[in-house]
Amino acid sequence: MIPDVSQALAWLEKHPQALQGIQRGLERETLRVNADGTLATTGHPLALGSALTHKWITTDFAEALLEFITPVDGDIEHMLTFMRDVHRYTARQLGDERMWPLSMPCYIAPGQDIELAQYGTSNVGRLKTLYREGLKNRYGALMQTISGVHYNFSLPMAFWQAKCGVEDVESGKEAISAGYFRSIRNYYRFGWVIPYLFGASPAICSSFLQGKPTTLPFEEAGNGMYYLPYATSLRLSDLGYTNKSQSNLGITFNDLHEYVAGLKRAIKTPSEEYAKIGLQKDGKYLQINSNILQIENELYAPIRPKRVTRRGETPSDALLRGGIEYIEVRSLDINPFSPIGVDAQQVRFLDLFMVWCALADAPEMSSDELLCTRTNWNRVILEGRKPGLTLGIGCESAQFPLAQVGKDLFRDLRRVAQTLDSIHGGQAYQQVCDELLACFDDPELTFSARILRSMIEEGIGGTGRALADRYRTQLREEPLEILSEADFIAEREASVARQKKVEAEDSEPFEALLARHA
């Protein structure tokens, strides 16, 4: 089932320097909660500056949903320590509040009013909040409070020079973009390995169903918890953050211009369903527009091609201008075993896997095959640890045992690991291969199995509260290592000043901005 990557691996072993200078970044979301696990109803802490313009600390959907961002970094330990400093400083500013350590929220009552993230009075700030109002009215607020970790990854220029013979970013942007699209197609075909190893949401609180019927064969563990015995990541299931109306958009990952055309089509195609919501009620805006996507960010995807945008640019305009600059991997649940929701083992695994995705052959994929890849993901998400589970290839009928496919993949990953270890010294990447390979013989070693044992004993709420308390104490007591308190104070003040500047420079009425998004 795994493509034959032996030639590409032999090439890599002859050109190890092609992997010198991989760049990464991390984003981590987490809900602010009270000591009893209920959602905090306070505003974004003033000590954390402006959520609109702060470089490292912002908010996602809700005012209580923090998002932490690291700068681009070539050093894994430095990046994780930076992320930990942001957590340490934040933990000290939250008073009695904690950071929820799980992807799935728990103590949110059906119909509870969840305050949307607020970004001030500027047009861009108001548009961000209105976009969230649209998400709430389209999908419900509860789905939007699910948290994850995003891993941003780019291969060094040396890789593309050695692999494709490109000279620089400008002349090589077509070849580099094609290379990243190959990675994305492989990710759709084989990325289910991420929830298998690291999925950590095998259960949900009953409040999450909000009384809606479900066809999933949930088991009840008392204490208001529903779980699937072999599930890995309900966050990635249809219960979690997905968007059914998008499955027939026909967006593919074969060609940059085709991809962008599909995205632009979706933000201009009216939706009958969303038209029923309306645009305004009693003078209050309800969504940016009633198209299938209000803006490009609404496209739900487990992985995204990206380029840093310039002022006023949409994500797709940036891609057309400069090609794909990096890839955003979006399938990681919050790691409940780490105070910062992610650890070095995961980052190293993703390095290995994304390099493999860039090396392995990846035939073009129709939108039909893209939908078929979802079958494997759904199997792993809902019953990934089930003994004897099999997976298919695309829309074909042949089936292969997951455990064997995983072991075959790791045989390749080990060779990538040897190359990366030869550059960095030590055995860190090969050690990750040893640790994770064991999960295919013994699924009880996976994150989902480990956290489910605790959840069945303590409930989701009990597990989440205990971890939140432990990490709060730990983070508050640890000294800062890279950033100083003065750095955080300076960034708070600078971010507030930047927001004021944005607000002062607004020249057009908000309605004119909305008209451009119609």
From Swiss-Prot:
Q: In which pathway does it act?
A: Sulfur metabolism; glutathione biosynthesis; glutathione from L-cysteine and L-glutamate: step 1/2
Enzyme Commission number: 6.3.2.2
- Cross-referenced InterPro entries: Gln_synth/guanido_kin_cat_dom, Glu_cys_ligase, Glut_cys_ligase
Keyword annotations of the record = ATP-binding, Glutathione biosynthesis, Ligase, Nucleotide-binding
Superkingdom to which the source organism belongs: Bacteria
Return the GO cellular component terms, semicolon-separated. Answer: cytosol
SUPFAM superfamilies annotated for this entry?
A: Glutamine synthetase/guanido kinase
Q: Does the keyword Metal-binding apply?
A: no
Q: Which Gene3D superfamilies match?
A: 3.30.590.20
Q: A single Gene Ontology molecular function, please?
A: glutamate-cysteine ligase activity
GO process annotations (BP): glutathione biosynthetic process
Reaction(s) catalyzed by this protein? L-cysteine + L-glutamate + ATP = gamma-L-glutamyl-L-cysteine + ADP + phosphate + H(+)
Q: Which PANTHER family match?
A: GLUTAMATE--CYSTEINE LIGASE
Family, as annotated: Belongs to the glutamate--cysteine ligase type 1 family. Type 1 subfamily.
Q: What is this protein called?
A: Glutamate--cysteine ligase
Q: Which organism is it from?
A: Klebsiella pneumoniae (strain 342)
